[in-house]
A protein has these predicted regions:
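Single conserved hydrophobic/aromatic residue that forms the stacking wall/gate
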Residues: 1-11
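Flexible, active-site-adjacent loop/turn segments at secondary-structure boundaries
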Residues: 2, 19, 32, 112, ...
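Mobile active-site "lid"/loop adjacent to the S-adenosyl-L-methionine
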Residues: 12-13, 18-45, 49
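Phosphate/oxyanion-binding loops and surfaces in catalytic or ligand/nucleic-acid-binding neighborhoods
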Residues: 21, 79, 107
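Alpha-helix initiation/capping motif
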Residues: 35-39, 93, 124
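Conserved Class I SAM-dependent methyltransferase catalytic core
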Residues: 40-97, 101-102
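SAM/dcSAM-binding transferase cores
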Residues: 96-142
Length: 142
């Protein structure tokens, strides 16, 4: 995103599945490491550049590991962004959330943050109706 900053372009919608492994085991494949680890693109850097490229009423959508929620909250505050929606993604009922879907805005939201929960499976390969509804266009056997 650094190459776009300063171009004068702004975007109404930004969607990112950023690198999010921090200080974790790496593999021999450098390209894979670059895509998956925060060595070359931290969440702070991503949000700083995204904020600069965000239209006044635009939105940034992210998926992160759930354990990065506090870090995201700190970054949002630093970049003068606002959390408008958050979804905790849970693999199976009773499990801890594994992912966080977050939507950020540059302007304070009119309503409080909308929080929801998405459970993926009821049991192994028995997907919830909500998950099927959201993903059926992307899978052949859903």
């Amino acid at each position: 995103s650094a190459c776009l900053v300063g171009s004068g372009d702004v975007y109404k919608r930004q969607v990112s599945n950023p690198p999010y492994f921090v200080d974790s085991l790496k593999c021999p494949d450098q390209k894979r490491n670059t895509a998956r680890h925060t060595d070359t693109l931290t969440l702070e850097d991503l949000l700083q550049d995204s904020r600069k490229l965000l239209a006044p009423q635009g939105r940034i959508a992210l998926i992160l590991p759930y354990d990065q929620k506090e870090r995201l909250t700190d970054c949002i505050r630093t970049q003068n962004l606002y959390l408008s929606k958050e979804t905790s993604v849970i693999p199976v009922p009773g499990a801890e959330p594994k992912r966080l879907l977050a939507e950020l805005t540059a302007e304070p939201p009119v309503f409080p943050t909308f929080s929801s929960q998405l459970t993926i499976e009821i049991a192994r390969h028995q997907y919830t109706d909500e998950y099927v509804s959201l993903t059926k266009d992307f899978y052949l056997k859903m």
